[in-house]
Amino acid sequence: MRWIGLSTGLVSAMLVAGLVACGSNSPASSPAGPTQGARSIVVFAAASLQSAFTQIGEQFKAGNPGVNVNFAFAGSSELATQLTQGATADVFASADTAQMDSVAKAGLLAGHPTNFATNTMVIVAAAGNPKKIRSFADLTRPGLNVVVCQPSVPCGSATRRIEDATGIHLNPVSEELSVTDVLNKVITGQADAGLVYVSDALSVATKVTCVRFPEAAGVVNVYAIAVLKRTSQPALARQFVAMVTAAAGRRILDQSGFAKP
């Protein structure tokens, strides 16, 4: 992956830290069912957490033999809506505090949420950057097909905040439900460029060119995680949250492009 607007030293540090392409970028599906007789937890998590949480889940299972971790990855607002409409899960991890607050206001949290990571936005362009995109303002050029997230989801809210702060308003050809949907449209050539989180751009390192822009630094999404009141495995749910926020989880989050809260 080529990075524009990012120092060579930082790119090298990211590569040394183990940032490699993620094998799958398909839309999230419902969690797989647990193995018969096994204890399991269901984790509803923002789509941007897919790579990091899959790795954390493997470590969690290794430390808890016989336990399954079943993930549902999707846009945070979609997951929050499912929870408030009666869906059952053990843990919720949101890409912003607003969606966590909506679940808290519905009385669905077993305790207080914990802020565990932050993320910022980056432009992803088709591999090689054939449209020569260099800045956020370039996304307004005539004839450029740009995709973003819907304003109702955290990545779309972040995009809107950047627009408001800069006075530069985009005219996207589509608004997607999650960052993975935005990435897929750029990777498959359905769009020339899109706005996603840094962590998601790193997960498709060989398939896109990333363009850093200074305006993104002023808009930071804070990720929150909490145990849900409807959990059937409260002890395991708390252990999973503890792993995410402890050193083992922090290492994986760092390697996946997330910053500390």
Curated annotation (Swiss-Prot):
Alphabetical list of Gene3D superfamilies matching this protein: Periplasmic binding protein-like II (3.40.190.10)
Could you give a single Gene Ontology term from the biological process aspect?
molybdate ion transport
Q: Which Pfam families match?
A: SBP_bac_11
The residues listed in the UniProt record as binding molybdate, with positions renumbered to this chain, are S48, S76, V179, Y197
Q: What is its main location?
A: membrane
Q: Name one GO molecular function term.
A: metal ion binding
Query: Which stretch is the leader sequence?
Result: 1-21
Which Gene Ontology cellular-component terms appear in the entry?
plasma membrane
* S-diacylglycerol cysteine lipid sites: C22
Assembly: The complex is composed of two ATP-binding proteins (ModC), two transmembrane proteins (ModB) and a solute-binding protein (ModA).
Annotated NCBIfam families: modA
Similarity field? Belongs to the bacterial solute-binding protein ModA family.
The protein depicted here goes by the name Molybdate-binding protein ModA
> Source taxonomy lineage?
Bacteria, Bacillati, Actinomycetota, Actinomycetes, Mycobacteriales
